[in-house]
C-alpha cells in the first residue's frame, strides 16, 4: 500500500467521523491576539485519544484555511487565532528541518507524504502525531493521528541525530534530509518512501 493509497483510505473515513471543519473566510479580518512568539517549552505532553483525528487544510503556502475542533483543543488555540495563520505556528524546535524538506519535496511532486511530527501547543507543551499530507485542490489536506507504531521509537532516535547534525554541523535542510534517509536505510528501509508506507 502506498502513502497515496493510505491517504485516500484515511480521507474516505473522514465521513465516518463527526468532524466539523471550520472554513476560514480569507477576506475577513482575523485578529491574532495572544499568538505565542516564542512560548516557553514545557516537557509535558498534551493528551489526546487514539480515536481522535486532527484535520487541517492549507493553501499552497501553508496558510491554514480549515481545521477541526480536535486540532484547536490539542494545539490550544482559538479559531480566531488559527484561521489564516501559517501552519508552522505549531512547529516544535525539536523537529529537524530535514523532515520538512522531505515532506515538501514529495508534495511538490504531487504525492501524499507521511511523517512523524512533534508539535508545540500554545502553552509550550508538545504533542506527537503521524501526519498524512495530501495535495488537494488549491492546497493541502493534513490528517494527523496519535503515533502507535513500534517504529516511533526509531524515529525519535533518527530525529535526535538529525537535529544534532543540523545544530552542531550546520547542515542545510536538504543535507539533513539526505542524512535522515541514510539513517533510515541503515535501519533497514530501502528509502524514505518505503519507510512512510511502513510507518
Residue spans for each PLM region:
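Sensory/regulatory domains in signal-transduction proteins
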Residues: 2-18, 34-164
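Sensory coupling linkers of modular signal transduction proteins
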Residues: 138-198
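Intrinsically disordered, low-complexity N-terminal regulatory segments enriched in Ser/Pro/Thr/Gly
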Residues: 19-27
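N-terminal flexible/basic segments that precede or flank functional cores
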Residues: 26-35
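Extended hydrophobic/Leu-rich segments
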Residues: 10-14, 24, 171, 184
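A broadly tuned "polar low-complexity/structure-edge" signature
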Residues: 45, 61, 193-199
